[in-house]
Amino acid sequence: MLSQVASGFTEFDPPKGRPSTADGPLGWPGYDEMRARAQDRTGETESVVCGTGRIGGTDAVLLGFEFGYLGGSLGERTGDRIEAAHTRARELRLPVVTLVATGGSRMQEGMRALVQLQRVARQTALTAAAGLPQLAVVRDPTTGGGWATLAAGADVVLGLPGAQAAFAGSRVRPPEADPAAYTVEAQHAAGHIDRIVPEAELPTALSRWLTLLGGSADRPQRPEPVPVPYALPGPTACGRLPDSGPEAVARARAAGRPRAAAYLDAFLTGREELGGDRCSGTDAGVLCGFGVHEGRAVAYAAQCGTPTRPAGYRTVARLVRMAGRLRIPVLTLIDTPGAANGPEDERAGAGPAIAEVFTAVAEATVPITSLLIGEGGSGGALALAAPGRLWVTPDSYFSVIAPEASAAILKRDPDQVPRTAEELRLRPQDAVELDVARGVVETAHGAARTPGVPRPELRPDEE
């Protein structure tokens, strides 16, 4: 598969390993003969082939597993090669792409094989700390330690349709287990794989991701902030600021108001999305990924106007942390009535998930630019707002809680909701006056803005 995804592949010389003993570290009867037969069958001397190649317009270090060599299993010499490949990647400042197809640790080497997972994990951690992106392609099968380190631990995980992907291999699962639970499709639905890609489309998909994430060696330690997008015109009001709290709420909730996808399409090109939180699932109401604005990569996290679920918050936190390591500035688009608050959301860890986002934003090592494009409902919205770098659109509101909920907390009758909305001072211009937001952005056609507030532009020194 290496030749299918990369041009000009040049294999590394195998590292000088430890002295070989007959039949391996355990003296497993017939092990040398097994390796010899595997070499005759595949033409390879180990289960992984490593080298450099070019994917699209990006040079990368590639690791390709050969499942025909003892089931792609990881042994001591496999660990030697993976360690050497990651070391070269850090020396050359190149991203790492791993094409995984493995049954796990090599039985014939026992614990000496199992501890290779620790070596692999250390190497991937060092490469991540060096700010280099790691992509993994899950082929059939990807099980055991290979799934739990090289595949599931990558920044971006792509899966081939129908491939097995699981920690438990097919021969060690419970007999009553549903085979569908151990597939790429199941892992994607659970938020562990970002995208399922047909094999014919894999070179293009890898090229797009490397274009977005590669080049971290050339990025400044502290990149310039993302400029603030213009507001998109809504169905009514033509950019005029709302006169009252109830009007602000009504405009933010209007069915025809532009949503996050429209803003992203207008602001970014070449978008690629992350597909989950790497924990429990996905949230269709949150879009996270990377795109290009005026020639440079931008990470984005955008709420789509629905209550945000725990998986959505964890995906946002994942994105912010990844962007920090890769030195890519972040844009957040805020639009939610609040965090999802059903029993299933509490069981899924709504509080800890929101805390993850607050922490990720507070600790961010790259600048975050935030724009409120619709509803700003309580802490579920505030979690995505960068302190000191928040702007608001004319069709938005930001409130400590939705006015209906506020009235209920204050034990007011439902007919007091409009009064409550007024008293909360939740209009976009109120957010500016209360020093919550820096300004109200202009609409794309140049409508009015808050008097005295200049058109928002972030300068490099505004950090």
Which stretches of residues belong to each language-model region?
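Intrinsically disordered, low-complexity segments enriched in small/flexible residues
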Residues: 1-55, 203-298, 302-307, 449-463
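Glycine-/proline-rich flexible loop or hinge segments
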Residues: 32-34, 63-71
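Glycine-rich anion/phosphate-binding loops
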Residues: 42-46, 72-84, 276-285, 308-319
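A structural preference for short, pocket-lining loop segments at secondary-structure junctions
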Residues: 53-66, 81-106, 290-304, 314-341
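Glycine-rich phosphate- or other oxyanion-binding loops that anchor nucleotides, phosphorylated ligands
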Residues: 59-61, 67, 75, 113-119, ...
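Active-site-proximal flexible loops/turns
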Residues: 73, 108, 251-252, 342
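Conserved catalytic cores of soluble enzyme domains
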Residues: 102-221, 338-462
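A structural preference for long, well-packed, hydrophobic secondary-structure segments
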Residues: 128-129, 303-330, 348, 359-366, ...
